[in-house]
């Protein structure tokens, strides 16, 4: 069985601590855990950003983030299917450090829908919600 869980929350809400605890606990129970790193941080670290002197447009940045997130989510799910095939008695847990909906906070509803439309999602939030089995929102 493969499950996709999103770990989200504001700065200093404890995501890193909770993530480490989840991985440790599930590994004890022989569950294969795959952690999908936060996409925006990867892009920013690589030099692609929507702030500073060499910034790109905020909507273009969000499109890159969401497009990359979708690719990564699908790719890691495929890896989980490979594990499931090789080890049919072992469950797989995919933990995502943030999810597509987190990007709404950076551009607002109208612009977010515009980005979704660019990606062929037609502003349909249900297509996004249905990608996950559980969302854990940590608050500080």
Say what each PLM segment does.
Residues 1-4:
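Extreme N-terminal, non-catalytic leader segments
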Residues 7:
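Hydrophobic anchor at the beta1->P-loop junction of P-loop NTPases
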Residues 11:
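The conserved Walker
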Residues 18:
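Hydrophobic positions on the alpha1 helix immediately C-terminal to the Walker A/P-loop
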Residues 23-68:
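Conserved substrate/cofactor phosphate-moiety recognition/catalytic segment
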Residues 70-112:
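A basic- and aromatic-enriched beta-loop-alpha substructure that forms the phosphate/nucleotide-
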């Amino acid at each position: 069985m493969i499950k996709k869980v999103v770990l989200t929350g504001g700065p200093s809400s404890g995501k890193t601590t909770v993530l480490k605890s989840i991985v440790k606990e599930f590994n004890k129970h022989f569950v294969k855990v795959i952690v999908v790193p936060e996409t925006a941080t990867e892009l920013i670290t690589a030099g692609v950003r929507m702030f500073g002197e060499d910034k790109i447009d905020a909507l273009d940045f969000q499109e890159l983030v969401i497009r990359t997130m979708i690719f990564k989510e699908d790719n890691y799910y495929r890896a989980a299917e490979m594990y499931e095939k090789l080890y049919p008695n072992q469950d797989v847990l995919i933990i995502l450090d943030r999810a597509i909906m987190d990007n709404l906070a950076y551009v607002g509803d109208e612009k977010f829908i515009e980005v979704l439309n660019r990606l062929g999602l037609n502003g349909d939030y249900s297509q996004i919600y249905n990608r996950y089995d559980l969302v854990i929102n940590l608050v500080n």
